[in-house]
Amino acid sequence: MLDKLSNHIGRQLQQARQRKGLTQAEVAKRAGTNTNYYAKLERGEAVPSLKMLEKIVKALGVKSSDVLPF
């Protein structure tokens, strides 16, 4: 289940980032994290905390409901 969640979140983050025309480094900087961690999120290798997810969706200019499957 966690793999499914992390993969879903990763795909949604990547799509949102690409729609905005941003690089992973730009999103990571805006969210206050490092590029390697953000890249892991997009690949589905990590699940962000709610606090980090809040920062990332703000950096992307989307809502958390756009990223989460529920």
Q: Where do the language-model regions lie?
A:
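Phosphate-coordinating loops and pocket residues in cytosolic domains that bind phosphorylated ligands
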Residues: 40, 69-70
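A detector for short, charged/polar N-terminal pre-domain segments
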Residues: 1-8
